[in-house]
Amino acid sequence: MKRSQGFNFHYQAHGYHPFLCYDGLTGDLIKAKLRDGTLHCSNGADKFRESIFQEYLERGIKTYLRGDSGFSSPKLYETCESNGCSYAIRLKQNPALIALASDKEEDLYQATQKDQISYAVTYGEFMYQAGSWKYPRRVVFKIEKPYGQLTHMYTFIVTNMDMEPYQIIQFYCGRGNPFRKIYHIQTV
């Protein structure tokens, strides 16, 4: 790495962007790789995961992946699919996704028309093909109306799992546990 590359002048230190992979059941760290802080999240994620997939496939162990929108890339989806890995990866909200979820948004609006204070939620799914994808994939979504707010919040997840949309959202939300460990690593 070049001397000035990845240097954060605000913190007066070099930034690093590690890959960390945790076991979803035990919380154990499976693999880590320190990377330059100037790299995008998804850059090389497919290759990082491939060796893990191979090791687990040889042992006959089923693999699952949850990832935030920073890891959303066709290369990673394809690596998961070709290695038998079930995945749930968040997509960044965009107008095309919102338009495809508009029927359920209308249902949520109708359901809360007489009570716009309480919390409300709806789930759905559709097939979607982004411009960089070779073929359509299943996208599940959640639309929430938070308590005391009139606006809606969206969650879009691309997946190859066969579960109900709400179950996939629950599975995806389990990714928060490793983030507590990552925070701990950063503060040590």
Feature map (PLM): residue ranges:
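Active-site beta-loop-alpha junctions of metal-dependent nucleic acid enzymes
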Residues: K33-E55
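Short, conserved catalytic/metal-binding motifs centered on acidic residues
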Residues: M1, G27, Y64-S72, Y87, ...
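Short, surface-exposed basic-aromatic patches at helix termini and helix-loop junctions that form
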Residues: L57, Y77-S86
